[in-house]
Amino acid sequence: MSLASLDLNALWLEHSAVIATLFAFGTALFLVSRSQKQSLNLPRFEVTNDVLKTIEEAHAQYPDDPFILSMVGMELAILPRSGIDVIKTLPEDQVSIKRHHHDVFLGEYTYMGTKSPEFDEAMRYDLTRNTPTVLASFVAEVQYAVEDSFGRPDQWTAFQPRACMSKIASLMSGRAFVGLPLSRDNTWVDATVRYTQDVTRAWLVLRTIPWVLRPFVAPFLPQVRSLKNQRRMTEERLTPLLDPSNAKNRDEIPGGDMLRWFRQRYPQGPTPKQLARDQLLATFASIYNLSNALSYLLFDLATYPEHIEPLRQELQEVLKGEPVNKENIQKLKKLDSFIRESQRLSPPSLANMPRIVTNPRGLKLPSGHTIPCGMRIMVRAHTLNLDPNLWPNPTRFDGFRFSKLREIPGNTFKYQHATTGTDNINFGHGLWACPGRHFASSQMKVVLAHLLLNYDIKLPNRMEKPQQQHFGLAIVPDTEQMVLLKIRG
């Protein structure tokens, strides 16, 4: 045996010993943590196969009490509806959404959950106040984005909505975030779509590994290496945009507003790394959820075609041939209702309002239970969306359910898609309700309006509505199912 092979064997034995020690230590910590959670005076449900069925069974037994849900790589307390008012205004030192996002979405690689007051302020104030501004960029981009994915087929042509809507969401959001020409650059578009996919794929792997071992395993995952490369690429591509000379004439072309708002939030101007961080945070928040929601909307139009003509009629009566703008978008009540109903039955998650308890004394609930510090919590959304006391015949898709409710005196401004409350937490609720929900809702309306006015849509023959897929608590559309589109005559 050669000296080199002996050295390699010794090195392997040394590394194996370290890995074994770390694994034993990590497993021990994981078991101690699990035992502490099991000692809570809460009913515990373990997900073996069907997470949806498990949540429904747990809710049926404990409709007004919290319960522990145990899944691969995660245990959390699922709160009842009363938990919404308990946590909706609590600050980060009581329950933390940032810590949750950092843990779940691999913050050390994705920036999710990292401290970024400039990003928070731009999203919560600039974006919310200036939704009409980004609306103009959506309108300017929608035809290019839709035709780039679907073309203008004069015969019925099959498309996979999830793949197409990912690109449409990237183009539309990119136009608002960074503007032309970068937003249409193929490398940039592909990277933004891949970024959201890699975050999800990396988590699906890492969730099966004890948390103490994840820093040692993560750097070797191809998805994590890809995330690092995308961070570097984003910095490189955004650096030229920090040069004031490149801002000339940008005001004449809709788009790039988010980038400007990010820059204005830094007194000394952002570094390329800071700007890349803000851009990637906005990218993940928008593209992942938007592409899923747009896919569901296309499936629902194809599955429930009786809604298509009433929606087209509303668009024709309200728009009168003009593009969507800040005035007429408020009058599209049936379109808004259709989008909210689609989200009610196809929400982003089975539970929402994610937090980690950070108060050392724990979180006291109306039920008398105390959730300990360090415990992950969420509020059940699935059972809220299907509550027959809120929504008659809740499993039935009624695209105009909410527009009819708004016709009742006193309800004019209620039941809108972007409205949150104790009856709708699909965008969260309270202090940390999704700050981009009006941005997202406007983008969905612009895309849906363009599709309805320019395309016919249907399901392939003998195909039922595509089923949702569950990954943990996340709900995603079927990536393989097709819809048929053709350009209207």
From Swiss-Prot:
UniProt-annotated binding residues for heme: C434
Pfam family, one: p450
GO annotations of cellular component type: membrane
Cofactor(s) in the UniProt record: heme
GO biological process entries: secondary metabolic process
Membrane topology: Single-pass membrane protein
Annotated S-S bridges: none
A single GO molecular function term of this UniProt record: iron ion binding
Gene3D superfamilies: Cytochrome P450
Keyword Iron: yes
Reported phenotype of the disruption mutant: Impairs the production of acetylaranotin and accumulates chemically stable intermediates or shunt products such as cyclo-L-Phe-L-Phe, prearanotin A, 2-hydroxy-2'-ene-cyclo-L-Phe-L-Phe, 2-methoxy-2'-ene-cyclo-L-Phe-L-Phe, emethacin A and 2-imino-10'-hydroxy-cyclo-L-Phe-L-Phe.
Parts of the chain that traverse the membrane: 12-32
E.C. designation(s): 1.-.-.-
Positions annotated with a glycan in the UniProt record: N289
Localisation: Membrane
Domain of life: Eukaryota
Keyword annotations from UniProtKB, A to Z: Glycoprotein, Iron, Membrane, Metal-binding, Monooxygenase, Oxidoreductase, Transmembrane, Transmembrane helix
Pathway annotation: Mycotoxin biosynthesis
Task of the protein: Cytochrome P450 monooxygenase; part of the gene cluster that mediates the biosynthesis of acetylaranotin, a member of the epipolythiodioxopiperazine (ETP) class of toxins characterized by a disulfide-bridged cyclic dipeptide. The first step of acetylaranotin biosynthesis is performed by the NRPS ataP which produces diketopiperazine cyclo-L-Phe-L-Phe via the condensation of 2 phenylalanines (L-Phe). The ataC domain of ataTC then catalyzes the formation of bishydroxylation of cyclo-L-Phe-L-Phe.
Family according to the record: Belongs to the cytochrome P450 family.
Protein name: Cytochrome P450 monooxygenase ataF
Organism (species): Aspergillus terreus (strain NIH 2624 / FGSC A1156)
Upper taxonomic lineage: Eukaryota, Fungi, Dikarya, Ascomycota, Pezizomycotina
